[in-house]
Swiss-Prot record:
Family, similarity comment: Belongs to the ACDP family.
Keywords: CBS domain, Cell membrane, Glycoprotein, Ion transport, Membrane, Repeat, Signal, Transmembrane, Transmembrane helix, Transport
Glycosylation, residue list: N38, N42, N156, N522, N743, N751, N790
Organism: Drosophila melanogaster
Protein name stated in the entry: Unextended protein
Biased composition (Polar residues): 740-763
Domain CBS as annotated: residue spans: 380-441, 448-515
Binding annotation for a nucleoside 3',5'-cyclic phosphate: 604-656
Gene Ontology terms describing biological process: cellular response to carbon dioxide; export across plasma membrane; intracellular monoatomic ion homeostasis; long-term memory; magnesium ion homeostasis; magnesium ion transmembrane transport
Pfam families attached to this UniProt entry: CNNM (PF01595)
Database matches in InterPro entries: ACDP (IPR045095), CBS_dom (IPR000644), CBS_dom_sf (IPR046342), cNMP-bd_dom (IPR000595), cNMP-bd_dom_sf (IPR018490), CNNM (IPR002550), Ion_transp-like_CBS (IPR044751), RmlC-like_jellyroll (IPR014710)
Compositional bias ranges of the Basic and acidic residues kind: 822-834
Membrane-crossing segments per the record: 183-203, 245-265, 268-288, 299-319
Cited PROSITE patterns: CBS, CNMP_BINDING_3, CNNM
């Protein structure tokens, strides 16, 4: 019997070796127990024992779960949890049922108080040496022993029939199992697991959300953010300033809750399920989701959980604070993100699509960041492209007009060579200069002595901007460089000029165009597309035909007054170009009163009751006007005009169309050819006045029609200029208007031109208008006729009416000068085509 028992112990040890367990201390104890058992059997052989009917015996147990703790060879398991263990012995069969009791007894003794149900084996070895059971131990019992019996066969492995009595298998340590209860209840463990998972998510989110916001960004938000952002940043900034301490506290707290979560979850479950569930829970709910949320809303979440963060920092301070101090010493103080000039410019550029910056604001920021990199040589105007004046120039009307047309307010003045800049002329210096005095520019420059400032071409724009901003050197500087070319000594050479406007243009990355600029860009010479101002230099022209010459200023004033104040000379009747050319004719006169009596006829400009055919505008001096039979008298001064009735009828004149109005032309021809004033105008001081005769006025109107024809493309510019010059210069004060006379062939040409229109196809070739109304009606019907035919008809009609006007005063000889522009061959060929 002893040998039989020891063989079973050897089988148990061998089974442990098969399962990968070496003959350790527990196996040694098992052998020692077997020897003790053999000795006890020999000593008790003389005792009386009852006969055991059963042929099986259990000599040892082993739990299949490797994680179960073993103390002194006795396994310790958790209550109320399914446990699988293997029993070793002999004669084990499928109907060998076991149970557990808390009472000690010898082998073969009765098992009167079983503590668990009967359990049948899940599987049994073929030789009957081992069997596998699944058992759940109840609570409130600390130590269990095995009882067994041969039960009736049943399919339920957890419960067996109870009719056969149970036999105690002994109180050996190899047959003993201890239990323990969990430290906390299951429901409390579940709550703690969920709480740990929540804190794990919070710590993971704060780790990314808070640590991704550097100190510089928080300062920006505290100063420039919205009200909420300022509030949140103010709460976070004190904690974020302790970067390493915050990092260590968050990481330590995260590791703590994750470890607790894993341990508690392992207590509730075991095996592969616990591993998979804990991994998915931590990754999905503890890492990915919170970090995704806090990466976008880290500021708000960090501010609202700041108390939790401070609490964790306080709890983990004994460990996290020393570690953070070590990191501070090793890694240095955290400064935050710092942007240099290039990074700032690139930051503005790459975020242009998502920020609210305007394009001009982006350009200004970029320009300001590049000021230190650009030099004056990059933005200066070359000296050869600058508008300058020679020191020997005279400040006459032509020079001042040239200065005004240049559009500049500061004019460099050079002496001899253009690169020898000696002074500056400001446009305000000309305020008290009379152009009639022909003041030398040198005199004016010596009086004001405006200084000039020179800089080198490698000066950066930020330095120039500061100098211009101070105002000590003005807002213009000349750029010079050292010229060491050649064999001579090096010398300073002026190569260009730079102004405050140039620097500001580089600052805002755009061209500044004010009301006086001629060019959009001085370097590219791109002209500004703007309304063309009047060229006043034309009033300084001197014509030999003029017997009396006046100053250009007075000529300009006369032009402006006539074109704006006198209806007969406004631009819709007489164009500005024609009026300017008209004033270049011999229309200026003067009267000297010295040594003449009051009744001298040469002092009278108009005599009451004496017909006149001219218009008069007083420019200088005083005149006395006597009106009506009552001889009412008053004096008048400059820019008083008389005789407008001699030019136009006293009716409202409609604005002519682009090709002229036949109604207006016919009305001009039908009025009286002379005007009889009911007043007298006598000079009482030296007087300068202009006289414009009716025939010259009609010539100017005809020239205006020609100009409108040129604008519409009927005539070329050369044809127009030649014809206007001939028209205006053909009229002199002593010349009769014979140049406007036409012979019968010219008159017939005019009538033929009218009769050839579609509206007169049914009329006879000798048809002539009998009234002005007929001409007006036909003029309305001529709107759909070809452009060239209309122009020819209108101008021919003017010539015909001029002939009627002077038919009693001139010969019938044809004028030698052509009145109509000579059309080129291409235009004639187009007209000849059907």
């Amino acid at each position: 019997m002893n040998t039989y028992f020891i063989s079973f112990i050897t089988i148990i040890i061998f089974a442990n070796g098969i399962n990968g367990t070496s003959v350790d201390t527990s196996n040694k104890l098992l052998l020692q127990k077997a020897n003790d058992f053999n000795l006890s059997q020999n000593l008790s052989s003389s005792r009386t024992r009852r006969t055991i009917a059963n042929s099986f015996r259990i000599v040892g147990i082993r739990l299949e779960d490797e994680t179960v703790e073993t103390k002194n060879g006795i396994p310790t398991v958790l209550v109320d949890k399914e446990q699988q263990f293997r029993v070793f012995g002999s004669g084990l069969e499928e109907n060998t049922a076991i149970t557990f009791t808390n009472e000690k007894n010898d082998y073969g003794g009765p098992c009167l108080k079983p503590a668990t149900d009967l359990f049948t084996p899940i599987e049994v070895s073929s030789n009957g040496f081992s069997a596998l059971y699944s058992v759940k131990f109840p609570s409130f019992i600390n130590e269990f022993f095995i009882c067994a019996k041969t039960a009736e066969k049943t399919t339920n492995h957890s419960k067996a029939a109870t009719t056969t009595p149970l036999e105690h298998q002994g109180n050996s340590d190899f047959l003993k199992i201890k239990t323990f209860e969990p430290l906390i209840p299951v429901w409390l463990a579940i709550i703690i697991i969920v709480t740990c998972l929540g804190f794990s998510a919070l710590f993971s989110g704060l780790n990314l959300g808070l640590m991704s916001m550097d100190r510089t960004e928080l300062k920006i938000l505290r100063n420039t953010g919205t009200e909420k952002e300022k509030k949140y940043a103010s709460k976070i900034a004190p904690v974020r300033d302790q970067g390493n301490y915050l990092l260590c506290s968050i990481l330590l707290g995260n590791v703590l809750v994750n470890s607790t979560f894993t341990i508690l979850l392992d207590g509730l479950t075991s095996g592969l399920f616990a591993v998979i569930f804990s991994t998915l829970a931590i990754v999905l709910f503890g890492e990915i989701t919170p970090q995704a949320v806090c990466s976008r809303h880290g500021l708000a979440i960090g501010a609202k959980t700041i108390l939790v963060t401070k609490t964790v920092m306080a709890i983990t301070a004994p460990l996290s604070y020393p570690v953070s101090r070590i990191l501070d010493k090793l890694l240095g103080e955290e400064i935050g993100n710092v942007y240099n000039r290039e990074r700032l410019k690139e930051l503005v550029r790459v975020t242009n699509d998502v920020n609210d910056l305007d394009k001009n604001e982006v350009n200004i920021i970029s320009g300001a960041l590049e000021l230190r990199k650009k030099t004056v040589a990059d933005v200066m105007t070359h000296i050869n492209d600058a508008f300058m004046l020679s020191l020997d120039a005279l400040l006459d009307f032509e020079t001042v007009s040239e200065i005004m047309n240049s559009g500049y307010s500061r004019i460099p003045v050079y002496d001899g060579d253009r690169k020898n800049i000696v002074t500056l002329l400001y446009i305000k210096d000309l305020a008290f200069v009379d152009t009639d005095d022909n003041t030398p520019l040198k005199t004016l420059c010596e009086f004001y002595q405006n200084p000039v400032h020179f800089v080198f071409e490698d000066y950066t724009l930020d330095i120039m901007f500061n100098q211009f901003k101070e105002g000590t050197i003005g807002h213009i500087a000349f750029v010079h460089r050292v010229n060491n070319e050649g064999d001579g000594d090096p010398f300073y050479e002026t190569v260009g000029l730079v102004t405050l406007e140039d620097v500001i243009e580089e600052l805002i990355q755009a061209e500044i165009v004010d009301e006086t600029d001629v060019f959009v860009d001085n370097r590219t010479k791109t002209r500004r597309n703007r309304y063309k101002k009047a060229d006043f230099s034309a009033f300084a022209e001197r014509r030999e035909v003029q017997t009396v010459r006046i100053s250009p200023q007075l000529t300009l004033a006369t032009f402006q007054y006539l074109s704006t104040a006198v209806d007969a000379f406004k631009k819709d009747v007489i164009s500005e170009l024609i009026l300017r050319r008209l004033l270049n004719q011999d229309v200026f006169h003067n009267i000297k009163t010295k040594g003449k009596s009051k009744d001298d006829p040469s002092l009278y400009i108009f005599t009451q009751g004496k017909a006149v055919d001219f218009f008069v505008l007083i420019l200088e001096g005083r005149v006395e006007v006597t009106i009506g039979k009552e001889a009412l008298m008053f004096e008048s001064g400059p820019f008083t005009y008389f005789g407008t009735q001699a030019l136009v009828p006293n009716v409202v004149i409609d604005s002519p169309t682009q090709m002229g109005s036949l109604q207006s032309l016919n009305m001009d021809s039908k009025i009286r050819q002379s005007f009889v004033p009911d007043y007298s105008v006598r000079a009482i001081s030296d007087v300068i006045y202009i006289t414009i005769k009716r025939v010259l006025y009609l010539t100017a109107k005809k020239a205006t029609l020609l100009e409108k024809s040129r604008k519409s493309g009927t005539f070329s510019s050369e044809t127009f200029d030649d014809e206007v010059e001939r028209l205006l210069h053909s009229i002199t004060e002593n010349e009769k208007p014979s140049c406007f006379a036409q012979n019968q062939s010219t008159r017939r040409l005019s009538n033929r031109s009218i009769n050839s229109s579609p509206t007169n196809m049914n009329r006879s070739p000798d048809f002539v208008y009998n009234s002005v109304d007929e001409a007006i009606q036909d003029d309305t019907k001529l709107k759909n006729i070809k452009h060239a035919d209309n122009v020819t008809t209108s101008i021919s009609l003017v010539a015909a009416e001029l002939e009627d006007l002077h038919s009693g005063e001139q010969d019938t000889t044809a004028a030698s000068m052509p009145l109509l522009p000579k059309l080129d061959d291409k235009f004639e060929s187009k007209q000849s085509k059907p």
